[in-house]
Amino acid sequence: GQKVRLYDVMQKTVDELNETKTIALHHAVEGVGTIEFATTDIGEAMDGADNIILVLPSIYHESMARKMVPHLRDGQVVLLHPEASCGAIAFRKVMKEMGCTADVVIGAACTLLYSTRIQKNGEVYIFGIKNAVPIAALPATDNARLAAAICDVMHWFVLTDNVLMTSIDNLNAMMHGAPMILNTSRIEADPPQDYLYYHDGITPSIGKFVETMDKERIAIAKALGFHQRTIREEYIDMYSCGDETTP
């Protein structure tokens, strides 16, 4: 029931979206969503917005924060979706550096809610939606405000204690780095090989290697005083998949 606006840096992308003002979803979710407008002007996108959801790789969090901070207004909620690790801390750091005193909530999700790929502008393929994605605010005293703004609108987001937990809950360090390095020969093959990163690239041996790496993440969580599910447990819980289909 909330109006949705989109911000993008590509004028061509924005122009095409504004022609239809729709985004079509396929596979795990079927339907067509309507947007209010798309724009390359971050101030226009943020003006009057209650909830601002930042969906982009973590290497751009700082630069986007610098664009966004001058336009932040009291009462707004920003959710880094996902934050990777320590994204909320980086965002707050930029706010402090730029002298921003706006009373805003900065939240962080440990991972992206959906597994998806764009098919063409305005059309996306949803492979799956996670059953639950933990989120938290920085500072944690804002958790109730974050829950009211985000969890009440999108029930898949569930509140956890703090952004330290969401940062440790980031699985990308295991699932992206190791399989990519161990598939270097496929990636560099000439002629190029067409393979599916997860289904073909994560063999039983690579899966075991990833699980071994994951033990360090679990140990860090334990040392910090909280329980952390293993990467195998997380994937089974998130996608309701059987053990035999989990790397």
Locate predicted features.
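Small-residue-rich helix-loop
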Residues: 206, 212-247
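Residues at the C-termini of beta-strands that transition into short coil/loop
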Residues: 8, 42, 82, 110, ...
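Conserved N-terminal Rossmann-fold NAD(P) cofactor-binding segment
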Residues: 3-49
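Rossmann-like NAD(P)(H) cofactor-binding subdomain of soluble oxidoreductases
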Residues: 58-120
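Generic structural signal for residues in well-ordered beta-strands
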Residues: 4, 38, 106, 158-161
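Substrate/ligand-engaging "lid" and interaction regions
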Residues: 93, 113-213
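Rossmann-like NAD(P)-binding element
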Residues: 29-79
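Conserved hydrophobic residues forming the short capping helix/wall of the S-adenosyl-L-methionine
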Residues: 21, 92-96, 221
